[in-house]
Amino acid sequence: MEIGVMQLCNMLIRLKGAVKQGAWHHLYLTTKLCSFIEPLWQTSPILGLEKDILLMVTKQLWKLMDLREEVTRRGCGGMSLETRENKEESITGKEVKNLITQILLLLIDVPGMRDTRFLNCPHSLLPLTSNAELLKHCLMAGKWSPKAEMIILAAERSEH
């Protein structure tokens, strides 16, 4: 598959593991990923992608979001016994951001995604011509900044 769906699924599984280990503060970014991926399986004939595979990816993201309550119940900095025992396998916040970055860059490069309302919503605060361009610029430069997060939030606002 051109967009590396299996690669995407593997990254999501790692991200899910990270959230279980307490990286709950990255969950709001995964909400945006859900918004980006979900329309793909509805337009899969245009993109030439397998609808059931994209649906599986979307479901994996929503499962990840379902962990929010579980993690919140355990408390912000709480590490489970299992996590403490397997600390050498734990994932850092920086790795979580890198995973999210890779996923977003994969999505931006999906044929047709550039033209969707999720990545190309116009916003007067944005200096570049599209959210996709700005997001890619920020992420390629290694700047996971408020600016990069701002365009994700701007995309969300444009839906409402």
Curated annotation (Swiss-Prot):
Domain of life: Viruses
Main location class: host cell
Intracellular or extracellular location(s): Host cytoplasm
Gene Ontology cellular component list: host cell cytoplasm
Keywords from the named record: Host cytoplasm
Subunit note: Homodimer.
Full protein name: Protein Bel-3
Organism: Human spumaretrovirus (SFVcpz(hu))
Gene: bel3
